């Protein structure tokens, strides 16, 4: 079975089927989640030095920081699944 990969920006790809959440990094609980993932060694930063605009949370506990907007990432997932309704 082929694994669906999601372009997380700057030539970096993430397994789309493993994602459980795509959130904005602005709230205190998400900042705490990012900090805890860094301490556990499960933080993946794919921003290439740019500002973090989305935090992707995987079912394995890994937290991925992306410089793309959450809406952009969600749109890419919907497009890859063939669901263009956006709902």
Swiss-Prot record:
One Pfam match: RemA-like
InterPro entries (UniProt xref)? RemA-like
Q: Which domain of life is it from?
A: Bacteria
- Record's HAMAP family? RemA
The UniProt similarity line reads: Belongs to the RemA family.
Q: What is this protein called?
A: Putative regulatory protein Synpcc7942_1027
